[in-house]
Curated annotation (Swiss-Prot):
Enzyme class: oxidoreductase
Disulfide bonds: none
Superkingdom of origin organism: Eukaryota
Organism, scientific name: Didymella fabae
Protein name, UniProt field: Dehydrogenase
Entry annotated with the keyword Magnesium: no
Enzyme Commission number: 1.1.-.-
Entry keyword 4Fe-4S: no
Amino acid sequence: MPYTTIDDLVNSALDYVIIGGGTAGLVLAARLSEKDSVNVGVIEAGLSRLGDPKVDMPTGAALMLGNEDYDWNFKSVPQAASKDRVYHIPRGKMLGGSSAINFMAYGRPCAADIDDWSSKLGLPGWSWNELLPYLKKSQKLESDLPNIKQRDANLFPFLADSQGTDGAIHTSASPWHVPFEDDLLPALDKTSGYARPKDPYSGSHVGFYRSLWAIDRSKKPVRSYSASGFLAPIIDRPNLKVVTNTVACRVLTDSNEDGSMRATGVEVQHDGAIHVLSAQREVILSAGAFQSPQILEQSGIGDPAILHQLKIPCIIGNRNVGNNLQEKLLSAVVYELAPGTMSLDSVLRDPELRKEHQKLYTEAHSGALSGCINLTGFLPYSSLVTSDDIDDTIGDILSLKILSGSPQSPNQNGPFQRWQREAIAARMKSLNSADLQFVCTPANFDTANGYGNLARLSPGSPAGYNACYSLVVSQMYPLSRGSVHSTSSNPLDAPEIDPGFLSHPADVDVIAAGIQFADRVLSSEALRGKVGRRVVPPPSLDLQDRDQVRDFVREHIVTYHHSLGTCAMGQVVDERLRVKGVRSLRVVDASVMPMQVSTAILATVYAVAEKAADMILADHP
């Protein structure tokens, strides 16, 4: 596949320079270059991994996590609320960014998640109805495949009108699942008391169901991600130039006659040499939730006090840059299955079974290697706890109860921060809010050993146990806030990431309630004889004792890879994603999302980028 040399890019008359060829950046590259008269340049720090089997195979993420050829392999600072653990924070280091290294979950947010951006935060253009066309625009539902056409709509629900069919990102359903899930899904329904959603992609997804994944099953199943979907089909466009192995150091700015600042280009490093790329129209920062704020700070845009410490001249002071970091967390309940019942652990343990599933993947496009997670579901917090528990949690939310020493926003009681707390508190009271997600995982999900290196999350069942099954729990609307900032004036130094995990007690409460529910399901009468011993939490832990469950949660979490909010709309960028105080500079990636949404953020990031492309083209007709 042809790529551009750095010299060619330096000598090109570029209208737009996109920093980051990741999930959002390649959407912009494809859409902006549809206009023949526009010249687009893309800078990517990683390499191209198109056609790489580790990227393509749906179960290949475990081979990339922690591998610095594929993963930036960031680490958090020690987390006080979790006994000073240091967490692995993966980010894709290649064309496609984190869409090339994630677990390919495809979901859409609740309508209220997006409507709040518009109605409560005052961001015109960002309602659910205004974002939905862009959610559909990026998607290509594989509607002709038998497992879609002949699906049981009660098990695998969606309405055809809500789906996109002409987009770049394939979405599909797995043709294979472990037999245990035939019994698990009714047990989830009965224990929760919630019916299955009619269409979890139309703005409400409470209940349990088989879900879509970003996997292209038109031939042998492969990951569908921004490099394969948006870039590969159009890489030969003469007005699109992509250079890899090139790090953006800082955005270059100049002053206008009226004293205002504007972005003029980007300083980059390639093979140790510094180069300057000029942008005639705009510089667009799409480096992700950790590196977009880092590059802003390296460019002199950020908190003046932090920039002073780094000896970086302050061009535009904005104390919000790098703050408001939000990340969901995962914990899990793990049971062994009855003797002879298979899960992915069986495939990991048995070489002959592994060969069988490799053959299924290659020849029948099925089996565990084609994508083994099928079931997910969402429940309200209020459906799982007592009214007194709800009152206690909401009291903590509204009273600014935060662990001492945790990262905090510059103005904890400002309108933006109050809006977040009030929105989450209102959701916690509702019996229709998707506050918790449950990911049904046919393997031992080992958070105790995986937090520092996510490649160790699925080690197989422990010695002396049968194959295992996990109900993985996540809180969708975390209250804890973190930060990411540069550590020096050297743009090659990794940023300091302090997610503030579990620094707000409400996050512990919500995950603990999910752990208790997961155990009620797996120990229910409906699954008697289908499961054996509880593996995690250990049988000695009393899951009826909320304090014991809270302690368990603090020691058994990993990241969900959904970090966002560090260049938030309304704080760092405006509603058209323009950096405040600097003309011709935008940020387009997960960092602009002001608050977490209920579900994986992949589809929302694609939609934000699709919408941003239209806004950019409208501003430069």
